[in-house]
Amino acid sequence: FLIDKPGAVQSNILVGQVTAPSSAANRLEMGTMNDVLAGTFTSRINMNLREDKSWSYGTRSSLPAARGERPWLLSAPVQTDKTVESIREIQREIAEFVGDRPATPEEIDKVRNRDVRALPGRFETNASVGGAIAEMITFGWPDDHVRTLKAQIEAQTDDAVRAAAKSSLVPSQMTWVVIGDLRQIEAPIRQLGLG
């Protein structure tokens, strides 16, 4: 989908697809694969488009919590004259991530360690404890979920994270939305044949 924003100095590239619900057995691995690919500042796509190429101030993906199928969403605001090149880079990064350049042990370990270290801060207030209880009820997680979460995070295997990426991210099923100055970007984007 293309949405015109005449005179825009940047384009916002949005890409996403439906994935498994928050109650899925591999929900932690899905979160880890998301963070390696595009969910954190040091993720592959952000490092590529922001740090290596300087085409974007920052990209980010997310897996919002949901009882049913939930979206994997990536947002990449990029400079207008690099819109098509950025789309190609995102396509390449995703294809390689589920193909011949999956998450490395170092990338996975970095996310696991960060998630474990963040645990104490997740339960500092009454509101955060209440939120954790609400999540357990909403998603059908066991009563000992909070107590066992550290062990669950640490138990994620590299192969399980890579399998979550392959089962969750299917490039041919992704929906693309680009918002920008169509006078400048429409023709080259249409040549990509995104959908």
What are these regions (language model features)?
Residues 1-42:
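His/Glu-based metal-binding/catalytic segments typifying zinc-dependent metallopeptidases
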Residues 10-21, 30, 46-99, 105-158, ...:
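M16 family metallopeptidases and their MPP-like homologs
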Residues 164-167, 190:
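Short proline/glycine-enriched turn/loop segments at secondary-structure junctions
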Residues 185-194:
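Short, aromatic/basic amphipathic alpha-helical patches
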Residues 180-184:
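A short, acidic, flexible beta-alpha connecting loop/helix-capping segment that sits on the rim
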